[in-house]
């Protein structure tokens, strides 16, 4: 059975240890890699702008509340770079299930059971839920996932709202949730199983066969169908009940003054909507944040491993910001809490400086041009963090289903 971490004190202690070690790795990398700060390269300094007085904040909050309480067409235009195919942030749409895998309660029941079953993995110890736990925002609270074998270590992204993503995984190697399920199961660095093993497990247990028969009547047990069942379940894991969503539904009091100021910062001065836009707060595209560990033991080329295009070196998919406060640590490295990420973005990140022997290296990573020093003050950063907190969903507790065993009768009673 899957062992869940829960909400106890052990998780923060473990996270602190992991993040301390991760920070040491980053510092060692930065200490041995020539860098240039963006403000230095521009010939200036990233000086924080003056903070507002309490009276000025109150006046600004009242002004913004009058603007943002209305239709989105009244909102001020966001600060967007030329060429960005931008969409306004807002409520989630309805989930569209593909024609090749229509929604059914029977498939969801089978998929949920498979999702929580560690016996699908080659070790018998890793379930999908091991890295995507409901009580941890459908992530796992770790800096990086614990793979079966050494691989580029990456943070486990939440699967909440994955139904709205066109490409899955940090490098976008899956083009559908069905592909994501199949690849997670068979990847030797993840669950490391085989289609035959999964099919054999389900075929050999009477209650699993009964669940399968309900989901796929009169069809033989296949790996493809089982992946469809898990994907069907994953498409039911959606949000849309955050305080931001309440605000969008017309509850003007759902956001505090600080959160409202943070919303305006998010769309404008902080430049967040260049990449984090649309209903899921992600453009679904790939960007280089300067965190690929170029030339180091932990180098991770990201999207390049999928496309082979040198322009994709160091690029990773923009993560959703919905539930971001519950799915820390953040970035594909899993090395940062929210405050650290905001501070890095405010500084414009750092830019690797090519050394002479790297001048013609086609695999030298190039940081996203959207990352620029912002000159935000600590008050601004606190307001931004406050707004991002409004994207948090109500805590979701889902009890794992009773897993079918050889001793069960064939009744499909495990939903």
Give, region by region, the residue ranges found by the protein language model.
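Sec-dependent N-terminal signal peptides
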Residues: 16-25
């Amino acid at each position: 059975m899957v062992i869940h971490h829960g909400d106890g004190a052990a998780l923060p202690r473990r996270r602190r240890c992991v993040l301390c070690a991760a920070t040491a790795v980053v510092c060692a990398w930065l200490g041995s890699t020539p860098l240039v700060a963006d403000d230095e390269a521009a010939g200036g300094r990233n000086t924080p702008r003056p903070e507002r007085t309490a009276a000025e904040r109150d006046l600004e909050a009242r002004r913004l509340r009058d603007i943002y309480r209305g239709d989105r067409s009244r909102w001020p235009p966001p600060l967007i770079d030329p060429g960005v195919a931008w969409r306004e942030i807002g409520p989630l749409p309805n989930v569209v299930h593909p024609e090749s895998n229509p929604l059914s309660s029977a498939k969801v029941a089978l998929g949920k059971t498979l999702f929580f079953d560690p016996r699908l993995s080659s070790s018998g110890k890793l379930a999908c839920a091991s890295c995507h736990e409901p009580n941890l925002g459908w992530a796992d609270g770790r800096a990086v996932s614990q793979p079966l074998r050494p691989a580029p270590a990456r943070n486990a992204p939440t699967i909440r709202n994955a139904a709205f993503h066109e490409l899955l995984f940090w490098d976008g190697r899956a083009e559908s949730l069905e592909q994501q399920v199949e690849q997670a199961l068979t990847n030797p660095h993840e669950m490391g199983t085989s289609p035959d093993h999964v099919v054999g497990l389900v075929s050999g247990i009477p209650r699993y066969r009964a669940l399968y028969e309900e989901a796929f009547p009169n069809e033989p047990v296949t790996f493809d169908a089982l992946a469809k069942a898990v994907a069907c379940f994953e498409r039911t894991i959606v949000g849309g009940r955050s305080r931001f969503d309440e605000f969008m539904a017309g509850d003007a009091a759902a956001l505090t003054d600080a959160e409202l100021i943070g919303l305006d910062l998010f769309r404008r001065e902080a430049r967040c909507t260049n990449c984090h836009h649309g209903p899921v707060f992600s453009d679904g595209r790939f960007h280089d944040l300067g965190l690929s560990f170029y030339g180091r033991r932990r180098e991770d080329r990201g999207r390049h491993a999928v496309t082979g295009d040198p322009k994709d070196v160091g690029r990773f998919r923009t993560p959703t910001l919905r539930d971001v406060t519950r799915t820390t640590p953040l970035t594909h490295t899993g090395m940062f809490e929210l405050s650290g990420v905001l501070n890095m973005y405010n500084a414009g990140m750092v830019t690797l400086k090519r050394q002479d022997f790297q001048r013609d290296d086609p695999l030298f990573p190039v940081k996203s041009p959207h990352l620029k020093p912002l000159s935000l003050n600590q008050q601004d950063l606190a307001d931004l963090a406050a707004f991002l907190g409004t994207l948090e969903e109500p805590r979701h507790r889902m009890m794992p289903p009773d897993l079918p065993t050889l001793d069960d009768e064939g009744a499909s009673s495990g939903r």
